[in-house]
Amino acid sequence: RREKFIPQIMMSARAVQDGIDLLSPLIVGPDVLSLSETVVLGTVSGDIHTIGKTLVSIMLRSAGFHVVDLGTNVPPEKFVAAARENNSHIIAISAMLTTTVTGMKKTIRALREAEESDQWHIIVGGAPVNGRFAREHNAEYAADAVETVNLALKACGIDPLPDEEL
């Protein structure tokens, strides 16, 4: 049978997170390109999933971005405040649960209603969203961490890096 129990899933997720924590300093070392741009990154309110967001953070840092990781279960106003405080032009929003799509919509709306909205590039990703969702909500969609990096580079006016350089 292909059944999985919640404790097994939780232990697996913890093991992956521990591996990421261990390997991250080796992936994002002193030799990476240094960009002046900051990316604000977080998982929307109501969602506590972190592995995908953490992988995106590592990829962005390895491409030279400074990343402000807001964590999980982040309310819309915290995304807005962090973008302002860090003078960021790129905000990456993650969700894993279909039940948190409403939270993503609220977050995008809060960012678009802010006076700085014309300066902000909003990138969305995660299981419950797609390109159509992003277009309908005036955002860009990244299917994976590499695409997130390429969209962030594009927002800075930099050509995307070939996959082997990420």
At which residue positions do the language-model features occur?
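Domain-level signal for soluble alpha/beta catalytic cores
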Residues: 1-90, 95-166
